[in-house]
Amino acid sequence: MTFNLCVLTPNRIVWDSEVKEIILSTNSGQIGVLQNHAPIATALDIGILRIRLKDRWLTMALMGGFARIGNNEITILVTDAESASDINPQEAQQTLQIAEANLNKAEGKRETIEANLSLRRAKTRVEAIVETIKRIS
Protein backbone atom coordinates (compact mmCIF):
# COMPACT_ATOMS: atom_id res chain seq x y z
CA MET A 1 0.00 0.00 0.00
CA THR A 2 1.62 3.19 -1.22
CA PHE A 3 0.86 6.83 -1.89
CA ASN A 4 2.49 9.51 -4.03
CA LEU A 5 5.07 11.89 -2.57
CA CYS A 6 6.17 14.97 -4.48
CA VAL A 7 8.94 17.20 -3.06
CA LEU A 8 9.36 20.52 -4.88
CA THR A 9 11.75 23.45 -4.56
CA PRO A 10 11.49 26.69 -6.54
CA ASN A 11 14.07 25.29 -8.99
CA ARG A 12 13.32 21.60 -9.37
CA ILE A 13 11.34 18.49 -8.60
CA VAL A 14 13.41 16.65 -5.99
CA TRP A 15 11.16 13.60 -5.61
CA ASP A 16 8.00 12.40 -7.37
CA SER A 17 7.32 8.74 -6.70
CA GLU A 18 5.30 6.22 -4.70
CA VAL A 19 6.29 5.62 -1.06
CA LYS A 20 5.02 3.46 1.81
CA GLU A 21 5.53 5.92 4.67
CA ILE A 22 7.15 9.24 5.50
CA ILE A 23 8.19 11.01 8.67
CA LEU A 24 8.61 14.77 8.47
CA SER A 25 9.40 17.69 10.78
CA THR A 26 6.59 20.19 11.18
CA ASN A 27 6.70 23.38 13.22
CA SER A 28 4.87 21.52 16.01
CA GLY A 29 6.93 18.30 15.94
CA GLN A 30 7.40 15.22 13.81
CA ILE A 31 4.51 13.44 12.10
CA GLY A 32 4.35 10.09 10.39
CA VAL A 33 2.19 9.62 7.32
CA LEU A 34 0.84 6.36 5.93
CA GLN A 35 -1.66 5.66 3.15
CA ASN A 36 -5.15 7.13 3.73
CA HIS A 37 -3.88 9.78 6.15
CA ALA A 38 -6.39 12.45 7.11
CA PRO A 39 -6.15 15.61 4.98
CA ILE A 40 -3.88 18.24 6.49
CA ALA A 41 -1.85 21.28 5.51
CA THR A 42 1.10 22.11 7.73
CA ALA A 43 4.16 24.32 7.92
CA LEU A 44 7.47 22.45 7.84
CA ASP A 45 10.49 23.25 9.95
CA ILE A 46 14.10 22.90 8.86
CA GLY A 47 14.61 19.18 9.42
CA ILE A 48 14.81 15.64 8.15
CA LEU A 49 12.36 13.88 5.85
CA ARG A 50 12.46 10.11 6.17
CA ILE A 51 11.04 8.19 3.21
CA ARG A 52 10.18 4.50 3.43
CA LEU A 53 10.17 2.58 0.20
CA LYS A 54 9.42 -1.14 0.00
CA ASP A 55 12.41 -2.45 1.94
CA ARG A 56 14.55 0.59 2.80
CA TRP A 57 14.49 4.12 4.13
CA LEU A 58 15.90 7.23 2.43
CA THR A 59 16.74 10.49 4.17
CA MET A 60 16.41 14.01 2.85
CA ALA A 61 17.31 17.38 4.39
CA LEU A 62 14.45 19.90 4.05
CA MET A 63 15.00 23.62 4.57
CA GLY A 64 11.50 24.61 5.67
CA GLY A 65 8.28 25.06 3.76
CA PHE A 66 4.79 23.57 3.62
CA ALA A 67 3.17 20.17 3.16
CA ARG A 68 -0.29 19.32 1.85
CA ILE A 69 -1.61 15.84 2.55
CA GLY A 70 -4.82 14.46 1.04
CA ASN A 71 -6.26 11.81 -1.29
CA ASN A 72 -3.16 9.62 -0.88
CA GLU A 73 -0.92 12.38 -2.22
CA ILE A 74 1.58 14.49 -0.36
CA THR A 75 3.01 17.62 -1.89
CA ILE A 76 5.93 19.19 -0.06
CA LEU A 77 7.02 22.69 -1.10
CA VAL A 78 10.33 23.71 0.44
CA THR A 79 12.97 26.41 0.08
CA ASP A 80 15.57 23.73 -0.62
CA ALA A 81 15.96 19.97 -0.28
CA GLU A 82 18.86 17.55 -0.61
CA SER A 83 18.93 13.80 -0.57
CA ALA A 84 21.45 12.57 1.99
CA SER A 85 23.17 10.56 -0.74
CA ASP A 86 23.86 13.82 -2.63
CA ILE A 87 25.46 15.60 0.34
CA ASN A 88 29.26 15.58 0.51
CA PRO A 89 30.11 14.67 4.14
CA GLN A 90 33.34 16.69 4.26
CA GLU A 91 31.69 19.78 2.78
CA ALA A 92 28.71 19.44 5.16
CA GLN A 93 31.02 19.20 8.18
CA GLN A 94 33.04 22.19 7.00
CA THR A 95 29.84 24.20 6.48
CA LEU A 96 28.75 23.28 10.02
CA GLN A 97 32.05 24.52 11.46
CA ILE A 98 31.77 27.78 9.53
CA ALA A 99 28.17 28.25 10.70
CA GLU A 100 29.22 27.69 14.33
CA ALA A 101 32.04 30.22 13.97
CA ASN A 102 29.70 32.76 12.37
CA LEU A 103 27.25 32.37 15.25
CA ASN A 104 30.03 32.95 17.79
CA LYS A 105 31.10 36.19 16.11
CA ALA A 106 27.58 37.44 15.25
CA GLU A 107 26.84 40.94 16.45
CA GLY A 108 23.35 42.30 16.79
CA LYS A 109 19.96 40.67 16.59
CA ARG A 110 19.79 40.31 12.81
CA GLU A 111 23.23 38.70 12.45
CA THR A 112 22.46 36.33 15.33
CA ILE A 113 19.15 35.24 13.78
CA GLU A 114 20.76 34.69 10.36
CA ALA A 115 23.66 32.78 11.92
CA ASN A 116 21.23 30.58 13.89
CA LEU A 117 19.31 29.73 10.71
CA SER A 118 22.54 28.90 8.89
CA LEU A 119 23.58 26.69 11.79
CA ARG A 120 20.22 24.85 11.79
CA ARG A 121 20.50 24.22 8.04
CA ALA A 122 24.09 22.96 8.41
CA LYS A 123 23.14 20.68 11.32
CA THR A 124 20.22 19.26 9.32
CA ARG A 125 22.50 18.36 6.41
CA VAL A 126 24.93 16.58 8.76
CA GLU A 127 22.02 14.84 10.51
CA ALA A 128 20.76 13.54 7.16
CA ILE A 129 24.15 11.97 6.47
CA VAL A 130 24.38 10.45 9.97
CA GLU A 131 20.85 9.04 9.66
CA THR A 132 21.74 7.38 6.37
CA ILE A 133 24.93 5.86 7.80
CA LYS A 134 22.96 4.45 10.76
CA ARG A 135 20.44 2.80 8.43
CA ILE A 136 23.20 1.22 6.34
CA SER A 137 25.08 -0.27 9.30
From Swiss-Prot:
InterPro entries, A to Z: ATP_synth_F1_dsu/esu, ATP_synth_F1_dsu/esu_N, ATP_synth_F1_esu_C, ATPsynth_dsu/esu_N
GO cellular component: chloroplast thylakoid membrane; proton-transporting ATP synthase complex
Domain of life of the native organism: Eukaryota
Localization, UniProt: Plastid, Chloroplast thylakoid membrane
Recorded topology in the membrane: Peripheral membrane protein
First-listed, main subcellular location of the protein, grouped into a coarse class: plastid
Gene Ontology molecular functions: ATP binding; proton-transporting ATP synthase activity, rotational mechanism
Key words, A-Z: ATP synthesis, CF(1), Chloroplast, Hydrogen ion transport, Ion transport, Membrane, Plastid, Thylakoid, Transport
Keyword Ion transport: yes
PANTHER family: ATP SYNTHASE DELTA/EPSILON CHAIN (PTHR13822), ATP SYNTHASE EPSILON CHAIN, CHLOROPLASTIC (PTHR13822:SF10)
The protein's assembly and partners: F-type ATPases have 2 components, CF(1) - the catalytic core - and CF(0) - the membrane proton channel. CF(1) has five subunits: alpha(3), beta(3), gamma(1), delta(1), epsilon(1). CF(0) has three main subunits: a, b and c.
Function: Produces ATP from ADP in the presence of a proton gradient across the membrane.
Family: Belongs to the ATPase epsilon chain family.
Designated name of the protein: ATP synthase epsilon chain, chloroplastic
Lineage: Eukaryota, Viridiplantae, Streptophyta, Embryophyta, Tracheophyta
